[in-house]
UniProtKB/Swiss-Prot annotation:
Keyword Cell membrane attached: no
Function: Antimicrobial activity against S.typhimurium, K.pneumoniae, E.cloacae, P.aeruginosa, E.coli and S.marcescens. Also shows hemolytic activity when tested in human erythrocytes.
InterPro entries reported for this sequence: Antimicrobial_7
Tissue: Expressed by the venom gland.
GO biological process: defense response to bacterium; hemolysis in another organism
Protein's UniProt keywords contain Secreted: yes
Similarity annotation: Belongs to the non-disulfide-bridged peptide (NDBP) superfamily. Long chain multifunctional peptide (group 2) family.
Name of the protein in question: Hadrurin
Keywords: Antibiotic, Antimicrobial, Cytolysis, Hemolysis, Secreted
Compartment annotation: Secreted
Gene Ontology cellular-component terms listed: extracellular region
Length: 41
C-alpha cells in the first residue's frame, strides 16, 4: 500500500550516503560540543 511505499522511500533516504554523512557530522558536532569523542558514545 501507500504506507509501505512511503516506508520504503524513507528507508532508502535514511540509508543513503548523504544522510549517513550528515548523521556522522551531526554526531561529531554534538560530541565536540559535549567534549567527548564519538567513539566513546
Amino acid at each position: 500500500g501507500i504506507l509501505d511505499t512511503i516506508k520504503s522511500i524513507a528507508s532508502k533516504v535514511w540509508n543513503s550516503k548523504t544522510v549517513q554523512d550528515l548523521k556522522r557530522k551531526g554526531i561529531n558536532w554534538v560530541a565536540n560540543k559535549l567534549g567527548v569523542s564519538p567513539q566513546a558514545a
